[in-house]
Amino acid sequence: MRSVLVLACLAAASASAISDGMYGTMVFTKDMMVNLDMKMKELCIMKLLNHILQPT
């Protein structure tokens, strides 16, 4: 289960990197994508921490 979360985080990070490159010319869109990317990473980290710390 943990590896699935890691893969999801990697996929989200690479997808945001691709979209960031695509929208690089539009500054407002790029800022929005960066904010979204940061939120996604925070969410992934929190989910991973919760999963690791949770007794199964």
Curated annotation (Swiss-Prot):
Keyword annotations: Secreted, Storage protein
The UniProt record lists the keyword DNA-binding: no
What does UniProt note about where in the body, tissue by tissue, this protein is expressed? Expressed in fat body and ovary.
Q: Under the GO molecular function aspect, what terms does this record hold?
A: nutrient reservoir activity
Gene Ontology cellular component annotations, sorted alphabetically: extracellular region
The source's superkingdom equals Eukaryota
Record bears the keyword Secreted = yes
| Entry's localization field | Secreted
Q: Please give the family membership noted in the entry.
A: Belongs to the hemocyanin family.
What is the purpose of this protein? Answer: Larval storage protein (LSP) which may serve as a store of amino acids for synthesis of adult proteins. The biosynthesis, accumulation and sequestration of storage protein-1 takes place during metamorphosis and saves energy for the non-feeding pupal stage. May also be essential for egg formation.
Q: What is this protein called?
A: Sex-specific storage protein 1
Organism field:
Amsacta albistriga
